[in-house]
């Protein structure tokens, strides 16, 4: 079932200023997205691969950090909880202190730049900071190099992280779990966090991974793509009926109030425990332009066809959905807003976020 959201747009535009009052926590796997920019004009004599002449390097937040960056860009107060790699250093008093490794320090610098709280970010000398290094030349990604560990956190590190999170729940309007299977979120840890949030009346929004089907019981909403949803129900989602059947099956499996299945160029489908029918929102993509100096504008692209770079689009959906519901929107309105935000970020290269001005302009374009 598709719905006309024309009547929702004025409500959502009035909702945007409320984002600045929201306090959102993000718990999950922290990553540094590193870009090596260069030029390529020749092939290597050693192999049939291009030689890239290095020009510059840039770092930005990935994983749970990208979720936090999306929330911060929309004006929310964000506190991030996760783990970076560390190294031990000897103090003058003779003791040892764990400091973030090079990538962890770069990640923390990115967090400070985005004004994201880092009190919940631990450095662990037994781990490395996850880094996704992309080599870009001629506007194309040549190769990606991953540096990471996927095993679970040590029990003492997990306990420290939980003890950092627990007192913060009193100030949070929502908590987002961003699970990339890099070791921070385990079944047991997720269950402890969900239980604590339930006791504190904090709604939880989850982007799950395929190895954890039953760890998120009690979440307000689960966000997954068609591939992940198909894995959960052990069959490919190839048409509307298979998507609807999967959504209905996942509600009791996850034990959550709602399931949101993102479908790329086909938009998203929303399933709620309280509704016998599902809601479908068609995709819309935008290309960010600047109509006037200093004034962000949105040029509407082709609906359901013009997709540029989907890196981090799922993080955008998760972020906006959680923030909008925390600010008072219905799940349907929040999903429509999240779908609109995703349509903006796919027009940007790499992991990206959307500003309130861009989102308001995109809503205006849809209304026209």
Model-identified regions with their sequence ranges:
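A structural signal for isolated positions on well-ordered beta-strands in alpha/beta enzyme cores
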Residues: 25, 79-82, 120, 174-176, ...
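Conserved post-catalytic alpha-helical subdomain immediately downstream of the catalytic base
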Residues: 253-257, 287-366
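Substrate-binding N-lobe of the ribokinase-like
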Residues: 2-15, 23, 45, 49-131, ...
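Conserved phosphate/ATP/ADP-binding segment of small-molecule kinases
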Residues: 182-300
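Gly-rich Lys/Arg/Thr-decorated short loops/hinges at beta-loop-alpha junctions or inter-strand turns
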Residues: 44-52, 138-151, 224-232
């Amino acid at each position: 079932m598709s719905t006309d959201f024309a009547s929702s747009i004025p409500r959502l535009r009035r909702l945007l200023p409320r984002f600045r009052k929201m306090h959102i926590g993000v718990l999950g796997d922290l990553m540094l997205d590193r870009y090596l920019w260069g030029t390529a004009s020749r092939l290597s004599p050693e192999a049939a691969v291009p030689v890239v002449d290095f020009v510059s390097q840039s770092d930005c937040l990935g994983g749970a950090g990208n979720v936090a960056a999306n929330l911060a860009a929309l004006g929310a107060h964000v506190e991030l909880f996760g783990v970076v790699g560390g190294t031990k250093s000897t103090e003058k008093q003779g003791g040892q202190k764990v400091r973030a490794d090079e990538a962890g320090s770069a990640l923390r610098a990115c967090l400070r730049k985005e004004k994201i709280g880092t009190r919940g970010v631990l450095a662990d000398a037994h781990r490395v900071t996850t880094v996704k290094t992309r080599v870009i030349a001629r506007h194309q990604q040549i190769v990606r190099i991953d540096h990471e560990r996927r095993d679970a956190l040590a029990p003492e590190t997990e306990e420290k992280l939980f003890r950092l999170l627990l007192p913060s729940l009193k100030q949070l309007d929502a908590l987002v779990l961003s699970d990339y299977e890099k070791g921070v979120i385990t079944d047991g840890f997720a269950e402890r966090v969900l239980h604590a949030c339930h006791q504190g009346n904090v709604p939880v929004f989850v982007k799950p991974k395929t190895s954890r089907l039953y760890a998120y019981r009690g979440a307000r909403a689960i966000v997954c793509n068609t591939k992940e949803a198909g894995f959960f129900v052990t069959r490919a989602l190839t048409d509307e009926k298979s998507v609807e059947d999967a959504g209905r099956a996942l509600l009791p499996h996850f034990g959550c109030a709602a399931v949101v299945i993102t479908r790329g160029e086909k938009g998203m489908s929303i399933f709620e425990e309280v509704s016998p029918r599902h809601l479908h929102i068609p995709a819309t993509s935008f290309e960010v332009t600047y109509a006037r100096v200093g004034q962000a504008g949105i040029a509407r692209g082709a609906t359901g066809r013009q997709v540029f770079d989907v890196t981090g689009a799922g993080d955008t959906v998760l972020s906006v959905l959680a923030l909008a519901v925390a600010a008072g929107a219905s799940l349907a309105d929040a999903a429509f807003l999240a779908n609109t935000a995703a349509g903006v970020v796919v027009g940007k290269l790499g992991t990206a976020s959307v500003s309130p001005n861009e989102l308001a302009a995109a809503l205006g374009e849809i209304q026209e």
